[in-house]
């Protein structure tokens, strides 16, 4: 529990100024976290130094460059180009890589890169400084309320094999808590 609290405090110290000031500070932080997140995800699959991994890293950087351009509608083309490049690697190196390797690499771009980019995009909106905090407060509130509700009254396991400590009561408590924080 102490490790979680210390990690949370460090995260707030780094994240709060980036979210408040936005701009290049938040942009650089999101790009950095996207690259590290992709690396960590690809490392699990043993692909972090492979051509598929390099394709994911390059796609992440290009996606962010286009995201901040005057006309960012082309950023989705990066996703399509990344998929085509990964499939090309798959075909020309067959049977070195499996289809699941493509999935790991492409999933990192979608799940890590694009999702973090939405934080930057949200911050750029009118009143974005408040909206982006709402995302974090709701997420942290959900985790906190789910944890304490589950510890206090959780009896019905939600997914015993996948996550043995999570309960249905905790999930409901998290949703109610996040909703309450969002309303406040």
Task: Describe every region a protein language model picked out.
Residues 1-184:
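Membrane-embedded alpha-helical bundles of polytopic integral membrane proteins
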